[in-house]
Amino acid sequence: MNYFSLTSHKKHRGHPSAGPSNAYQNLEKTSVLQETRTFNETPVNPRKCIHILTKILYLINQGEQLVAREATDCFFAMTKLFQSKDVVLRRMVYLGIKELSSIAEDVIIVTSSLTKDMTGKEDLYRAAAIRALCSITDNTMLQAVERYMKQCIVDKNAAVSCAALVSSLRLANTAGDVVKRWANEAQEALNSDNIMVQYHALGLLYHIRKSDRLAVSKLVNKLTRGSLKSPYAVCMLIRIACKLIEEEDIPSEELSDSPLFTFIESCLRHKSEMVIYEAAHAIVNLKNTNPRMLSPAFSILQLFCSSPKATLRFAAVRTLNKVAMTHPAAVTTCNLDLEGLITDSNRSVATLAITTLLKTGAESSVERLMKQISTFVAEISDEFKVVVVQAICALCTKYPRKHTVLMNFLSGMLREEGGLEYKTSIVDTIITIIEENADAKESGLSHLCEFIEDCEHVSLAVRILHLLGKEGPFAATPSKYIRFIYNRVILESPIVRAAAVTAMAQFGASCPALLSNILVLLGRCQMDPDDEVRDRATYYLSILNSERPELYKNYIIERENCSLALLEKSLVEHLNGDVDTRFDISIVPKAAIVKPVIANDVMLVTSSAPRPPKITREEESAARLAQLPGIQVLGPIHRSTAPIQLTESETEYTVQCIKHIFGQHVVFQFDCLNTLSDQILENVRVELTLPEGFTTRAVIPCPKLPYNDLQTTFVIVEFPPDAANSIATFGATLRFVVKDCDPNTGEPESEEGYDDEYMLEDLELTVADQIQKTRKNNFQVSWDAADSEEWLQAEDTFVLSAVTTLQDAVNTIVKILGLGAANLSENVPEGTHLHTLLCSGTFRGGAEILVRAKLALSEGVTLNLTVRSTDQDVAELITAAIG
């Protein structure tokens, strides 16, 4: 028993109520670093040095920061320990090197010692030495150890081979060109009998070849013949096969004949349960499948639901839970098995079973299921509470009449203890219910008002206040919400107080009966100690005191949100230019609607890292375009389109195009990829065949396009003066100079090349490309305000022969026009024969657009389209786009 175990034992004996102690919890960095002097003693005391190294590693892993000097001194002292032959001490030294390698300076001094251990006869050293060596190796010295790495990849010792393969995978991110040369060794390791070596070898091979789609296809086709013995490797191969199927976008009628799908389906009969589950999970998550393809996979999941192993039950019910909304009919066949899991001893399994039943069950079973889940919801973790909330959200959409039961359950969950993510999911669900179900608005707002009375999360309080300001004025009794909002001004932090001031102003602007009271409350807010709160109160008071409805609409009710990144860019340009002129905020593009990205569950790599803030495509493009010479003269960017492919995915050269729309210009961005390893392209540019009225202003070529390196060329084109002629089709040809090169080095064999060209798909410029969608909080107010001389109107009636349902008609109109739907009018209620679609947006140059589309379903779909815009040409263009 060591010293720390003995002292802990004595403490427990003398203090039976005391918990287990942590011998390292009171360490001080300075004293521990001073102890590293012990490393210089001769002979080395392994026991003492191991203890000191443990302290250092503990401090680092607890977040203690070492400055470069401290880390370097500690690192160099640690190198003295290589003279000891103690195995445990040597392994601790390797760990210390890995931890300090990113902080200390001149770490390459231990390269020779690590290389010696890596190539030595002591197998206990070799694997750890490889990992430590690769943590300090940079691109400049990697070639010096390349020979040793190749030898280790094919080493007979499985631990050594795995260490080399995993380290190679890490090095591939920084030295991909060098690691690519190790493909032959990785291929040899793939034939190993060891399951982990085979798994890591496949991972490295895929990483090396993943940018070459043809090479990946060959690898998969070779391995699907049954040469893999490792279940881990087979699982990875299933994921790679799924990725190829998704990229090829094989239609359902051809998918069953695909060799890749046949392989995945055959894995349902594998002897390993892990592989069977992976195959079933992959099939149910594939697109373009039909019930016949899904049936075997769901049968497997149904079988796993009754397994005695908790892991299999959990995996099966979790997968069923995820696909319950995409394949409800198939999941319903498992309902009896899921009912049996409601009382499962594993609370996680029980939670997933109930939430799956909530998604697929009948309306009559909602109360029973909610009662069952309420008995143990307090016992499960926040992660699974979020799953419950998501199921309730889906249920509210499916059965809107059950909103009272579900809303009461959610409000009860809001009052319980929980973290930010958990509470956010509940608030998101309540907001979704309020927006989609008018009958639930009053109760939903009341529950949220009660929540912010005792809400510790600032971000949630601000969101709820924003919602109250948007929805509260149009409730049956708006005045009852004022007390909750003003309480925030008295009791909360400055950020929340500022949000409360804005919410009160919206009540004053939308409810004339409450205006006098709101003015009094805003007047009190002018005495607030925080600048932001005072400024907002003064700003809104001046607008409300003006008694001008148009100011209410433009600056309080329908505030247009600018893209903050582009607003900042425009302000900087203004300050660097003529500051004597007034800044025109109308030239700044409106913030685009950012849709949440749905993760693909079949992806090869997932990450639990925090998600970065969502940015619009325009904000992302603005930084890149800013590097182009003279781009500033085009003004602010209006919008950027999604990329479109101009070539097939398996051709010699792949090209995709992004259209960046400005006020009077369009910048075509062509992203080019050369997939031929024996060629290097120079002076790469795209030549456009322009329709009448368009003018090319600049072509910015790509100087060099090496193998497998994505590069970009730009073409700047000016729009014709007449908006009606801005819808056009462009011919496109990729032109370049070809030079033959060495596939291994990428160096051209001669300085001379020859001109060549490659035909691309035609490129279309549509109405939707030129419109930035906006979303009006209160469309009717904006529509009524547009009934003035400043706005112009165009109207026409159409028969939409290509669609058979109102929902298809709505989807088609929104897609063609590129407008943002308001008041959830993009969703057509079931069983209706009449519907009105309300849309809004901004045309390039700043012209606002409002559209009201009245649809009627009889033998076909009849459309009455009314367009209001601040520009007559734009209104007529929108109308003509439908015809």
Curated annotation (Swiss-Prot):
UniProt-annotated location(s): Cytoplasm; Golgi apparatus membrane; Cytoplasmic vesicle, COPI-coated vesicle membrane; Endoplasmic reticulum
Superkingdom of origin organism: Eukaryota
Keywords for this protein: Cytoplasm, Cytoplasmic vesicle, Endoplasmic reticulum, ER-Golgi transport, Golgi apparatus, Membrane, Protein transport, Repeat, Transport
Principal location: cytoplasm
InterPro entries noted in UniProt: ARM-like, ARM-type_fold, Clathrin/coatomer_adapt-like_N, Clathrin_app_Ig-like_sf, Coatomer/calthrin_app_sub_C, Coatomer_g_Cpla, Coatomer_gsu, Coatomer_gsu_app_Ig-like_dom
Region of interest: Disordered: 1-25
Tissue: Expressed in ovary, testis, testis tip, young spermatocytes, germ cells and follicle cells. Up-regulated expression within centrally to posteriorly located germarial cysts and in migrating follicle cells. Widespread expression in imaginal disks including eye-antennal disk, wing disk, third leg and haltere disk.
Protein name according to UniProt: Coatomer subunit gamma
Source organism (scientific name): Drosophila melanogaster
Top-level taxonomy: Eukaryota, Metazoa, Ecdysozoa, Arthropoda, Hexapoda
